Amino acid sequence: MASSTDTILKGKYPAKEHVRKVVEYIKSKEPEAEGVLYLEAQKTIMIEDNDEAAPFRQRRFFYYLTGCDLPDAYFTYDIATDKSTLFIPPIDPESVIWTGLPLSPKEALALYDVDEVLTTDTINAQLALPNQTKVWAIAPQISTHITFLEFPQKDFTLLKEAIEEARVRKSEYEVALMRKANEISKVGHTAVLKAVKHAKNERELEALFIKESIANGAREQAYHSIVASGTAAATLHYMKNSEELDGKLNLLLDAGGEYKCYASDITRTFPINGRFTPESRSIYDIVLSMQSQCISMLKAGVSWDEVHLLAHKVAIEGLLSLGILKGDKEEILKARTSVAFFPHGLGHYLGMDTHDTGGHPNYEDKDRLFRYLRVRGNLPEGSVVTVEPGIYFCRFIIEPYLKDPAHAQYINSDILEKYWEVGGVRIEDNVLITKDGYDNLTTVVKDVEEMEKIINES
């Protein structure tokens, strides 16, 4: 029996609904807004000094208003008539022998949620129709051969802002795409759990995750996977994925497949030999508590700053209980000493991009506790946010705190010495914000006993 997710995804991507959301935002800024929205797909780009095309990644602004993943396409939408038109490349007889017949306008009309499909060789003629008023476009994404001569007014800034804000609140279809991406990524994460005890190298596990992603329908990765063993897990965006596993305690796997342009972003940390050391287990339990308490706060309207603050409070209490921190918990929080162990933001919006639009971060914030928080303000219903607390033992980050009396007074360096080999622990889920609560889209195992059981029975 097909799942509700699969049933939803049998329909068309709701491009027209998205266009109307974007226009609603534009009209909130300019109530009398009229004219034409104009967007371009990503171009076919050739690899430098090569006759092969570079890997294709559709422009997210274009996809949001079309659902079309074809390169070299165009899109217009007439605000007054509510008419959307997709322009796709015409048949190139020279290319058919190599790549087969392209999508026809008739096929495209049946596939995409637009009112009309024409070929790209007609775009300038369509833009030259009389009685035009204003064109809304994105400045860096306009081809040199495109002219807007018939438009007395041009706005190359508001459309991008409008799409970025509209993307925050996900439609039912978008949520289904992200749920599907999470389902596929669960297969990959579980496969890595089953393989880790007998694997020799990080790259084996990265390859396994990618294999399972592709085999189950996620042909692209949402981002470069992080497969960090041992102390490498203290590097937030570790990229090497090539170290031997022998002699390491834990593996941090931050990996998510992308399904039809929509991302998953999942992190799990687990023991390579199938059993956490006491030190690793104690840190894992703190991080799991950080995550569970933060998730329990989530609902429409909650302040993300407050949720992030709670994560630090839970971290401080946990590190105090282990003796890594010492002193008064309120003073430690006020000093921001916990940032030494939890230096990043609690999470970010998720959607077509891993770090999705609309978060309004303030990287100039003088308060280091909030400086790297990628979402500021209150979470709206329909948004999807990652909840990814972590505790890390990174010498490069922590040692300056040990040399600063303002922080050193709160850190027990003797007890800290026992935890360097833990490296880092992060747990990350993708959570939909609902009116009265939340819906966790991520179902990858994170209970310690269950993880260890899977590792040891494989």
UniProtKB/Swiss-Prot annotation:
Its cofactor is Mn(2+). One of its GO terms (molecular function) is manganese ion binding. Its EC number is 3.4.11.9. SUPFAM superfamilies: Creatinase/aminopeptidase, Creatinase/prolidase N-terminal domain. GO terms for biological process: proteolysis. It is an enzyme of class 3 (hydrolase). It comes from the Eukaryota. Pfam families: AMP_N, Peptidase_M24. Mn(2+) 2 binds at residues 254, 265, 428. It catalyses: Release of any N-terminal amino acid, including proline, that is linked to proline, even from a dipeptide or tripeptide. Keywords: Aminopeptidase, Hydrolase, Manganese, Metal-binding, Metalloprotease, Protease. PANTHER family: XAA-PRO AMINOPEPTIDASE 3, XAA-PRO DIPEPTIDASE. Belongs to the peptidase M24B family. This is Probable Xaa-Pro aminopeptidase pepP.
